[in-house]
Amino acid sequence: MLSRVADSLYWINRYVERAENISRFVEVSEAMALDCPPGSAEPWLPLIDANGERELFDQLYPTGNSEEVVRFLVRDEKNPSSLVNCIGVARENARQIRDVITTEMWEQINDLHWSIQEGERFWDQPPQEQLREIRRGCQLFYGITDATLSRDHSWQFSRLGRLLERADKTTRILDVKYFLLLPSPEDVGGVLDELQWISLLRCAGAYQMFRQSRQQMIEPKAVASFLLLDPSFPRSVRYCLERIKDTLRIVSGRSLPGAPDALECLSGLTLARWSYTSIDELIADGLHEAIDSLQSDLNSLHNLIAQRYFVAASLSPSDLSPPLAAGQMSASQMSASQQQASQPPDGPAADTIIPANPTAAELSPANLAAAKPTTSKLTQTASLHN
């Protein structure tokens, strides 16, 4: 498999997972706002912190009311992580590798993108219906991917992107709950506190499974233990880490035991730390510090994966840069650019890879709409390392 193809598959699924999470976060928060007692703090700003976009939001919306938060998270073109932009970037990455993904996958992500971009009927719906339709569209894409894509490297890199994004968002929303939603001790244990813990479980899509597996009162320790350490819930951190380790082993092609490299060491050590600990130990040592350390490990895993599989082998270590950085070109992009230099432009180059942290201009509807849905040609790039 080409590095460029693996890169696109990875980011398609990260962005679809991110969009699905945002739609669920906003949908749950809107429902929770109706149940909050009069005069209570609105549950909106923590969503900005969970997505790591507080500085940008404060610049764009100094007042920070609920309508502005929803607009920023869902439709704002200036927010590179807004729901609409995530779907647009996922669709553009899918367009570039249409000869690799299945027709059903392309049709689903393309339909979802254009229903958001051009459908007046879509935005005329109540907000809850809009978010529910987007969430279901993302989940349908997961189902189509699992049902139609062969269990080769294409599927493994798709799953890898989804799992890393899922683990990251689970830790972020849990961290926000512990240290941002309830700054005053008098709120702990009250009605608002219980509502917030229920909303946290719903944000993670975990409310019913928590009720079935734990069969106990909703209290902070039990919720944290379920989201972090449960081995069978598909959105728990431990579950994601186990599948990440398995996926990396399959992708590496290592069949014989040997000295593990940096990527295998980090994935194994991270999984071990979260498999052989208890929630009491995590809380005693500082849950916030443990989550911070885990997020750092997840970022390091992403960087190592990008350096091994998404950067051409011919590059020297000094040439390595953060994956999909805005404005940068990979070896395959430069090769494609040279091949197409004599051709008249007809939209974005087929081998252009959308950045992981794109600028607002790169994500504008006009720029995304300019892309023609034609199958890209595979350029000759370095194969994945085995």
Describe each region flagged by the PLM.
Residues M1-G327, D346-T359, A371, S376-N386:
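Alpha-helical transmembrane segments and their helix-helix packing motifs
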